Amino acid sequence: MKLLRKRVPQITRLMCIAIAFWVAAGFTAFADVKGTILDKEGEPIVGATVLVKGTQKGAAADLDGQFTLSGVDANATLLVSAVGYTPQEIALKGRTDITITLVEDSKVLDDVVVIGYGSLQKKQVTSSITSIKADDLAAGIGGATVGTALQGKIAGLSIDGTNSPNASSSFQLRGVGSVNAAQSPLIVIDGVPGGDIRLLAQEDIESIDVLKDASAGAIYGTRAAAGVILITTKNAKAGNVRVTYTGEFTTDFIRNKPDLLTADEYTKTVANATDWGYDTDWYDAVTRNHPFSQQHMLTLQGGTDNLSVYSSLMYKDAEGVVIGDNRKDYSGRINATYKLWDNRVEVGVRLQAREADRDQRGGEGTVGTAMRYNPTIPLMSVNEPTKWNVDEAGAGAAGGTPVSNIEYQYNNGKDQWLLGTATLKIRLYDGLNLQGSANVDRRQYQGVYYEDAKRYSSIQNNRAGYASHSFDKTTNISYDAYLSYLKEFGENREHRLDAVLGWSYWDSARETFSANNADFSINGIGPWNLGEGTYLKDGNAGMSSYKSPTNRLISFFARANYSYDDKYMASASVRREGSSKFGANNRWGTFWAVSGGWRISRESFMDDTRDWLSDLKIRVAYGVTGNNSIPTGITKPRLTNDAGGWLNSATGTFFNSYGPANNANPDLKWEEKKEFNVGLDFSLFNDRLWGKFDWYTRDIDNLLFEVDAPQPPYVSNTIWRNVGSMQNKGWEIEVGGNAIQTKDFTWTSTLNFSHNSGKIKKLGMEGQYIDGDGFPNPGNPGSPVRLSSGSPLGKFFVFRYAGVDENGNIQIYDKENNVVPATGNNINSSNRVYTGNSFPALIVAWNNTLRYRNFDFGLQLRGWFDFDVISQPSMYQGLITGTGGNNLIKNLYEENKHIKGDKVLCDYFIQDGTFVKIDAISVGYTLNTSKWNKYLQKTRLYLTLRDVARFTSYSGVNPEVNINGLQPGIEKLDGSSLYPQTIHATFGVQLTF
């Protein structure tokens, strides 16, 4: 008993402890858990499911992404999932209020690809299509335009443009597609064809899908010969209203300033140089140090299960590195969708307006002029040092100075865009939908120009100022209506049919007006009071207006995609299209395509590879598309009063004169492109690594071109004809993957390669040819481009350099390989050869995104390999004679100083332009601020450097010349390649509420 009495207190204590643990455990077992499920943008994921692992207990997230679970064990694990996101297991560890962030599923085969009038999962695609999502487009490219952001992202797509805020980008997909008709891909924005990519803000874009081959683009008919770029803008998701502000602040640093001769070096070096006694760095005079640009973007989105609204406002103020080259943009967009009657009817509206105010006094031409200008001419007036020099000390003979010509003018352009579409979608039956849209695309340009009375051109023409005012408006209207049918059938739903049948109408009309006058009594009032100038009463003022014939297209189209067991796929499309541009005999064309795919990885004999081979698919496609990109009204005779008229000064009566405007060709017909494409798609290691390979060949027949016509019998000196055929072919490789993927660190990398070559198969009659633009005076050396039957595209047509004679004059080889002087009868086309290659043998781009916890880092590299550039700066600013007194670039002069004679268009001035470029480096940090402020969900700070560095052995100014079109590879004196090369430094902040 004593022993028992001694142990009672101990037993009691043990029982109390056990009861305490039991009570605590009991309370924990019945605790409530609440939480919020968000995507990586901080937006609620409506309908996400949460299950307690090992139980049947679960909940779904509401419109705010919130959920509540009752009676959950403190050590339970939650299974969280949502469609399109990677499932997660979350250990509670006693927490009762949690925030869960899901990331999008990396299963690339389930990604949705937008195609003509519909969409497909990537695994079902049988054509060559490259897709870019919003995150991939924007990654690491702060402060960029859409065109700049696309650079290096898509194999086979080449983009040309400059750093000028007023420059536009030109696009070319898979090489040259025509000798004169449209060579740029068709831009389709939210289903509206013919869009202008300058209209869009990068933040508004949801995805970009590039249809590369004819089988993908044939359903767009006549305008898809050069490929199609489909751009889809953002829709709001159901859930709370989300507001995002993005501010970007950019400055530029000139990184590769040409080393020009100083005034002293100039007078000692350049033949017949005139020394005006001053030393002016004209390159510095026309450029700015660290111009400042800013952009502010505000987006608001939200909605319910039935209504969603996305809207945005944007303001941008950009200063160019060249004086007189500035731009301000204002943009607004609203996308709204409303579903009613149990989702059987869906109504949508998308509307965007944008305005750009452009100060376009300076630009590409300004830089070239400044680089060539005599450095001994003073910047400021000799007699009035506070004013710009206009015509003193040699400036008059040189046409005024580059600076005074900018400062003494007003040159403003205003671009206005309006893009709107209204859609109606009706679910007629399970899988059967009727959809229609009405679209408007209106663009207007207003140009206002005033030349000050103090400007050299006014002084030269003895007039007190010159003014002009112009308008140019284009309105495109289109309507679409189509039935779409989607059905899965069979015992295991192994058959899938996706079909479209529709009709389309599109028309375009253009109107222009311009007027000019000169010699105003009050300097500066001219643009806004044109009638006040004296040129009107003297009969020297000008006025013109124009209304184009309406360009109409009517189309009927159909497409069917079939797949069996996600293993065998086939697709076919056809479009019957009529164009008002052609005569009655050739007005209608039929464009069609077929393609097929085989997912070998799903075959039973591939079972042993499933642990590492996620997917392997072979694609084969063939399609025919057309091209009608020629002026309207050329198949019928027209009258014009371009000859002007005459004024009866005695009576004050003005008489118009009319005459034939063109040589009509009623037999003109469509260009036709036939394209064959073979492709291979693969993904490895549970989609950690993916890629694709494409090989293609294109044949373009019935080439449209404006050729010379003899007078007489023709009334005009040119006529449009179908002149021949051409071919291009090439290959593309795209590889990407999540190289590293851990809880805290991910590295995503993509690499693409492309190659293209082409030739003219036939061009007109025997011996006919087309020459490119001639090089400018002085010297008039001719054009380095000639197209003729059998000629390769991208080759230069020049003389062969054979050294210099004892006097330093260039010698060439004639057609018999004899060394002859480059003079007289030796300068003829029979002594020229095709040489070099202005199309890169290989274009490579490597894009990387690394994320460590809240930090992100981006690196983008791009290279053009084994291509040639012919340098106008080397010919015009590297020789001491025949330059018209141009200033020289030192390194080019050092290379060429053995040449004492005039320039000759020969292969001496061609050199390898191979380069590797760091397109962008970025670093960012994202801070989850919701824990401190319930309204501010997320803050992101980032710094981006664009156009960081270029590595090349090219000795000219810039090897990154235009490689689009029929005259590629030329570094021009006034071209985009001479616009200052700058490093763009952008600091950005993004706030999500």
Q: Which positions does each model-derived feature cover?
A:
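Flexible glycine-rich, low-complexity coil/linker segments exposed to the extracellular/periplasmic environment
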Residues: 256-284, 375-406, 525-551, 643-663, ...
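Short Gly/aromatic-enriched secondary-structure transition segments
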Residues: 259-262, 451-453, 515-518, 766-767, ...
